Amino acid sequence: MIQYIASDVDGTLLHGHATTLNPELFDIIRQLKEHGIHFIAASGRQYKNLQRLFAPVKDDISYVAENGSMCVHDGKIVSLGHIDTDLIYEIADAAKEYGHCHTLISTARTGYTDSQDPDYIDHIRNDVGYDMDIVQNVRDIKEPFIKIAVCDFDGTEKRLRAYFQEHFGDRIKIVTSGNIWIDFIAPNANKGSALSNIVSSLGMDPKNGITFGDQYNDLEMLQLSNISYAMTTAATGVADYATHTTDSVEKTLRKFLQTL
């Protein structure tokens, strides 16, 4: 029995340079709810941004935000990760040393950057739609850290990920999140463990779901549920962790609804 649906956002529900979700998805989520099936948005994005993306159904779904570092149900934080302050500083300093990249540091309240690059700031605030404050120095931030991400507009696979993996891979988990981001994940936090926590708190069996994803930060989530779909455009090897592939979450869920 399927009790929940969980889906990644970027590259899974949002494709290319799209900044808004397919309106059909909201109708599908409402139909799922009528059948007692709960929808969870699972993303590396911040919670407030996900609420805006899913505005028509924002109070009907749950959220696994910041790649599992922050889970919210019914407006209440279910779980919250934490990354050591000094480690955040080290990563931010390394990003500056590397050059040609930008950091986005997440707290439960908002995002921060010390980048002064106008194109990056415009991309985050207007294209992605994040809440983000600009600081001169990350050491000026006085809130607990739940995630740090690094952006390279030229893509992360060629050099950026290898650089940070070499310097920090033995101290913190590093995953690709979309094509231009790498995320540094709080200890014991990932989409799979976060999803398990949130559905278990709702009295559901974590195996009784359908999950969708396309990147390496989705692997634990895809392995959690009995039924899982990797996008046909997924990163190399991701499909090996899923039971099926699809080119459209909406199309797959429409077919699923027809079986109910």
Q: Language-model segments: which ranges?
A:
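Short, structured coil segments at secondary-structure junctions
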Residues: 56-59, 67, 168-170, 224-225, ...
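Asp-based phosphoryl-transfer active-site loop
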Residues: 3-18, 222
